[in-house]
Amino acid sequence: MNTVRLREILRQTDMATHRDSQQSPLKVLVADLTSETFSVIDSCGDWFGRYGAVLGYAIRLWGEFCTENENPVVIAAGKKRTAIVFRNPGTELVTFNTVSSSFGAELNGCGYCALVITGHLKRSGAVVVDGVEKHCVLSEKLRNARVSQVNLFFRNCGECLATGPSADNGIHFAAACLSGKITGRGGLGFRLGEKNLKAVVIHAASINDVRESIEQRDSANLSLLTEQAYRNGWAAVSNFRRRTDPRMFHLTEREANRRLAEYQGLFPDTASVIMLGSNCDCYDIVSIADRFNLCFDLGLDPVSTGNVIGWLLDASRRNVINITGFTGEDSEAVMQLIEDMAMRSGIGGILGSGTGFLASSCSDAASSFCIHGVECGPVDFRGSFASALNSAAENYFPVFFEMESGLCSKHPVFWTVLNEDLVLGYESLGLDPETEIRTLTTVSALKLKHAGSSEKYAKKIFGWNSDAAETGRNVWQLLNGINGVAGKIEYKIPDYFITDSDSDFPEPAVVPFSRLFDEYMTMRGYLYKEVVVNEK
């Protein structure tokens, strides 16, 4: 990375997003893994005012610590949200994961607003931080350890961000796990594996009340979001087969919990159910949950893993490759394949590179993001590259332009940008967008007929604080400025896609995705100057 250019971009962005702030300097803990030393620095308090205290702040810190030879991982703490910023191994662009967890509250309790991790350990180990001391723990027992084994190793030591063997073996879609959840897509596990870092353990005072309330809220939000997504046709059903199989409709959160009343283990999120289920010809929720739990324990992103298996099955049907005898319904074979991916064993060694690499190797590049005119990823339309969207909104709008409501049908691009800004803004302010942004779960109840100023409508109709949208725009500008230096931003998307027939819509709708995306980029190019909407 050209660090001279990066510093200039950061300076320009800081000037363009200037906002007076009375925030005093914030304490940041820096862990140098190479020397196994720790230091505490005072970071710029003005960044707090421009970019918020969590996500935006972490992105700005990443830019400050990045050099030509250093890819830092930055963890910023809020009391309810934790943001982790890193460089995607597939695209080399800066991306992030956010999660509701007491991890951030623990870090705050130790007196720090953020943790910056640089360098790499000599062998597998962990960073342990508590209110008294900071140290690195090295142990060969952690090498190729599963997430459950890592958590057991550090039991009673505090909140643990852990990786599995997929991170040790350089799988591009390796993920990290925290508080019983995958932190997100984008290859965080891979980046931690590069640093030989199996875990980050934080412990402060007892905050069980915070942890319990977070878990209860997450459960309620997931249930509501899943139900609304299926009802309104936001979620894909079987995207490798034009997403039309109605059987997946019955695997909503409520129905799945009823079926799994006696099941011991984690319950997969909506996208994981789709990718490890219908895309792999499996409609048994218990089998899907077993696959999800195995992915979690191995530190594999379940959505990307399902995408790889789905591509493999589809490529076999089209005689692009030959995998005689393997079917998605054979759960034993699928479970073995998932384990082979994490350990880079047999065919899993190739599959671990992701479908972008696989399709290119098979001269089948078009299907890496578009099969039969439909994109692969139900959540991330570039999911074949095992990378998250640059936008925080990916977790809340499974497909931006698939929504056909009174709110979005006339001006989908405007409302996409608005919601993206609000998600980025609330994430940066340490709030949960699922709770704060009501359009994400109740769009069908909104009857707005036209769009206007984002500030005006956000404040007047929803009671949103306009500072959230402004902060989100600042963060978007910062992230895309950094990524303009970090790597080449490519938007590989299909020309169109078809909405689910298993929804309230009488007929599948063809959405001109490329045209809408061009409009989106044009609007973003003006950085939210006054939007003129044609009401005709």
Locations of the language-model features?
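Conserved mixed alpha/beta core segments that line enzyme active sites in large multi-domain catalysts
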Residues: 47-105, 109-187, 268, 272-290, ...
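Extended C-terminal regions of large enzymes
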Residues: 16-25, 29-32, 38, 42, ...
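Short, Gly/Pro- and small/polar-rich lid/capping loops
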Residues: 2-22
